[in-house]
Amino acid sequence: SINYKNMPHQHLLTLLSLLPVGSNISTWWNFGSMLLACLMTQIITGFFLAIHYTANINLAFSSIIHLSRDVPCGWIMQNTHAISASLFFICIYIHIARGLYYGSYLYKEVWLSGTTLLIILMATAFFGYVLPWGQMSFWAATVITNLLTAIPYLGTTLTTWLWGGFAINDPTLTRFFALHFIFPFIIISMSSIHILLLHNEGSSNPLGTNSDIG
């Protein structure tokens, strides 16, 4: 055993060493916590980016250039937001892969809430990708939103509502910014439900070891 008494931050080390999880938990179980860390990073940096962003098709790109060049530490916020978004998806795909490998899909409520989270996350990332309103943003907005027209009966109406008219324009960007801002809070709510369901069901135990260390 390790003696923590003569070490700095002994209380924190003791707390971490007594984390009540079973011996079957490995590094692959860390990615859920890493996803929460990514989410918090995105919300904090996103808030500061939103302060300086202008949701207008003529000013959006200029506002991002201004953010990068003129706002103190703006380039750090922008790059952290972009890199953390990529890390978010790396973590979530590893998180899903671990769930598939160890049969976590057998816990239906946890798995379905997680699947819903993935869909919302992908939608959030798409809306964020469009916000700079560069050439690729316009192309992505046009192509992806046109997929809604494939929905029977409601498709055309949904697309027109999302565009705010009959073509991609200023109202579209305003809607995308509003949705990109509100979706992370929906993700927080869904994550809380996901965690509550997980604690109700319990995690998978691939080694079949006794996880009761009390």
Swiss-Prot record:
Its cofactor is heme b. It is a multi-pass membrane protein. Heme b b562 binds at H81, H180. Its main location: mitochondrion. GO terms for cellular component: mitochondrial inner membrane. Keywords: Electron transport, Heme, Iron, Membrane, Metal-binding, Mitochondrion, Mitochondrion inner membrane, Respiratory chain, Transmembrane, Transmembrane helix, Transport, Ubiquinone. A ubiquinone binds at H199. The chain crosses the membrane at residues 31-51, 75-96, 111-131, 176-196. Heme b b566 binds at H95, H194. InterPro entries: Cyt_b/b6_N, Cytb/b6-like_sf, Cytochrome_b_N_euk/bac, Di-haem_cyt_TM. GO terms for biological process: mitochondrial electron transport, ubiquinol to cytochrome c. Binds 2 heme b groups non-covalently. It is found in: Mitochondrion inner membrane. It comes from the Eukaryota. One of its GO terms (molecular function) is ubiquinol-cytochrome-c reductase activity. Pfam families: Cytochrome_B. Component of the ubiquinol-cytochrome c reductase complex (complex III or cytochrome b-c1 complex) that is part of the mitochondrial respiratory chain. The b-c1 complex mediates electron transfer from ubiquinol to cytochrome c. Contributes to the generation of a proton gradient across the mitochondrial membrane that is then used for ATP synthesis. Heme 1 (or BL or b562) is low-potential and absorbs at about 562 nm, and heme 2 (or BH or b566) is high-potential and absorbs at about 566 nm. Belongs to the cytochrome b family. The cytochrome bc1 complex contains 3 respiratory subunits (MT-CYB, CYC1 and UQCRFS1), 2 core proteins (UQCRC1 and UQCRC2) and probably 6 low-molecular weight proteins. This is Cytochrome b. It comes from Bothrops bilineatus. The gene is MT-CYB.
